[in-house]
């Protein structure tokens, strides 16, 4: 959904009701907004999709984009679901109402992530961008990791060292299909250089679990030139 204004508008709010079918079954949903960035020598582009903020503004002759994320459960009843999208102004007056529909099909996707990926994510960038301590950085890294995993994107660096007990749940998660054992560029916590003793421990632990062994990867040379 996109909103546009001929004049500057402030104090706007947008919301959406629950998606429901004729029998009252409900779909999980949330509103997201397009965040815009100015790219040098290119212009303004939409990039991230954070949750909708209250009391947003739209400048004259500009538009603001919104996305609606709808999620169905594995046993969701198939059929047509409807929700009411509402936009209100600074005085709480309704500016626009519109129905939004979502169709649920009679099949479900597997819990396992079908597409095998290994995306890099910089723990250092998270640390410096948020300006947090190392302990808080681990918490933030985990939140980023789980967010990507929810969207079926596999980050290669686990939130915990594979040698720790905390990593076991992630390595066993059917949505996770790759994880970094050594190498990469996120430091020791998320891969990094390993000595022979650590590699031996990693081998003994991971090789004892066939599922983990299939997911384990090494990335020792980034973009080799030869």
Predicted regions and their residues:
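Short, surface-exposed loop/turn segments at beta-strand-coil junctions that are enriched for proline
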Residues: 71-78
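Structured alpha-helical segments in the cores of large, soluble enzyme domains
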Residues: 198-208, 226
């Amino acid at each position: 959904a996109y909103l546009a204004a001929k004049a500057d508008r402030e104090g706007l709010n947008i919301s959406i009701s629950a998606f429901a079918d004729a029998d009252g079954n409900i779909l999980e949903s949330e509103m997201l907004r397009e965040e815009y960035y100015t790219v040098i020598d290119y212009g303004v582009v939409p990039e991230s999709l954070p949750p909708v903020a209250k009391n947003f503004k739209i400048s004259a002759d500009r538009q603001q984009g919104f996305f609606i994320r709808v999620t169905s459960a594995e046993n969701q009843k198939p059929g047509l679901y409807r929700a009411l999208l509402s936009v209100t102004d600074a005085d709480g007056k309704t500016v626009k109402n519109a129905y939004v529909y979502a169709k649920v099909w009679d099949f479900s996707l597997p819990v396992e992530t079908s597409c095998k990926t290994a995306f890099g994510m910089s723990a250092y960038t998270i640390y410096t961008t948020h300006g947090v301590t190392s302990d808080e950085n681990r918490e933030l890294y985990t939140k980023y990791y789980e967010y990507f995993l929810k969207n079926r994107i596999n980050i290669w660096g686990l939130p915990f060292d594979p040698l720790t007990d905390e990593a076991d749940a992630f390595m066993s998660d059917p949505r996770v299909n790759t994880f970094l054992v050594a190498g990469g560029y996120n430091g020791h916590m998320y891969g990094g250089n390993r000595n022979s003793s650590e590699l031996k421990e990693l081998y003994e632990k991971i090789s004892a679990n066939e599922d983990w062994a299939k997911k384990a990867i090494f990335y020792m040379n980034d973009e080799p030139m030869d």
